[in-house]
């Protein structure tokens, strides 16, 4: 129906100014999400300040408006409430990642005052008898966590829902012999995405994501590939920043798709990995103008940091694959 502003008044009164752009056809102005009780209401443009009736509609504050629209463009309804506005806020559900290997601790919180939070883990709606949030929720299997705020047994917030998935770490490959660095293939052309790469102009080995082998400053592309040394079993996040497009593959599957023509931007992806060597590939192209390529990762006991030449190797001997 419009928007609201507020002003603090004497005696801990909050005055709400409801700017009504779309006049309700049923004459009821329902302020969704506002749980506060009104002490008074009137039209700002009414010199006599004739009181407007207030009540509850779908458990939200409702104001009964005149049948005639005072101002077709913007009518301001003034509502006074005691104290701070009591706003229905959906609880926040958070965890280190949406995937996990063994167990996961999920936290549920709310900035709404004087409420208790209740939750379910089976995709049903929380009700007054659902488990009470008293600390982190420990998951041992895939689940959808749903949470809602209650007050005196009555729901006073929207429902929040977040799904968490238990996964199996991808197994590493076995390589007879390795050397530091990454192999590269260098391409030239007017690319719009990395899948446009065709025949390489040249090939070689670099320490890491080095673009110095290029023979021009625009309309070129690189494919870097080798193996990533994963130190510990766990969930890893990869962040890929590029200008223009790029893709990051782990174990031959696209994990981060940052392809296409664009200015510098970052995209991320998550994967569960077992320790050891994993197939690793980054494709990148530059069309025109400036270019950029940054690759970061983080994981168990590994704060976010760039992937460097200490983290990647190439195979010199035979590669043997383990079943996932």
Q: Locations of the language-model features?
A:
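Short, surface-exposed beta-strand/strand-loop-strand elements in extracellular ectodomains
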Residues: 239-257, 294-297
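Short beta-strand elements bearing conserved aromatic residues within extracellular beta-rich modules
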Residues: 41, 117-119, 246-248, 293
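Mature catalytic domains of secreted/periplasmic carbohydrate-active enzymes
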Residues: 1-93
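Short beta-strand-plus-loop segments that form exposed binding edges in beta-rich domains
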Residues: 281-290
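Short, compositionally stereotyped local motifs that mark structural "simplifiers"
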Residues: 83-182, 191, 195, 199-223, ...
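Short tyrosine-centred short linear motifs in exposed loops/low-complexity segments
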Residues: 27, 140-143, 232-238, 274-277
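Aromatic-lined ligand-binding clefts that engage carbohydrates, nucleic acids, or primary amines
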Residues: 108-110, 228-230, 234-248, 280
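Short proline/glycine-enriched turn/loop motifs at strand-loop junctions of beta-rich domains
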Residues: 24, 34-38, 110-116, 241-245
